[in-house]
């Protein structure tokens, strides 16, 4: 299951290649940021994935993307669920663990207001935690009413 965290090295490699292509395209357009949302990295049933293996794969993948594009800011956008029933990177805590383990200066987070409400997190607290660490690279503001991500404007 998953893309960057997939336990099949060929599939994870294809996902990593897409991230490299996104970085190249970002540079071509004169941009400086790439947001990675891991919609398929997760699970539907307990013990469906090897959690440690996926964590390690994701850390290595983020390190590789950051090393490939040291001139760009790479954002992780976490979400509690959708497309999978349970997303792997689903909270501010796990996102922070990934950031710490990857240990790359250009890796940070995009906080999505709706995603935080879906997980019953406090947006002000998340903003403070990532902001004080210098890892808050973006904020997405939309509604969702705290139960699903319909992506409608506020």
Pin down the residues of each PLM region.
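Gly/Pro-rich active-site loop or hairpin
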Residues: 6, 49, 85-93, 100, ...
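Active-site glycine-centered loops adjacent to acidic/histidine catalytic or metal-binding residues
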Residues: 112
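Active-site acidic/histidine proton-transfer and metal-coordination neighborhood
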Residues: 2-108, 118
């Amino acid at each position: 299951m998953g893309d960057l965290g997939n336990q099949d090295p060929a599939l994870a490699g294809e996902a990593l290649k897409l991230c490299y292509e996104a970085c190249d395209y970002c540079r071509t357009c004169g941009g400086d940021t790439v947001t990675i949302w891991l919609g398929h990295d997760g699970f539907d049933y307990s013990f469906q994935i090897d959690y440690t293996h996926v964590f390690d794969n994701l850390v290595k993948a983020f390190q590789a993307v950051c090393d490939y594009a040291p001139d760009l800011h790479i954002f992780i956008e976490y979400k509690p669920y959708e497309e999978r029933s349970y997303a792997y990177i689903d909270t501010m805590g796990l996102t922070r663990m990934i950031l710490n383990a990857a240990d790359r200066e250009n890796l940070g987070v995009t906080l999505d207001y709706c995603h935080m409400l879906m997980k019953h997190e406090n947006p002000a607290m998340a903003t403070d935690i990532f902001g004080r660490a210098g890892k808050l690279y973006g904020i997405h503001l939309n509604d969702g009413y705290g139960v699903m991500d319909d992506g409608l404007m506020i």
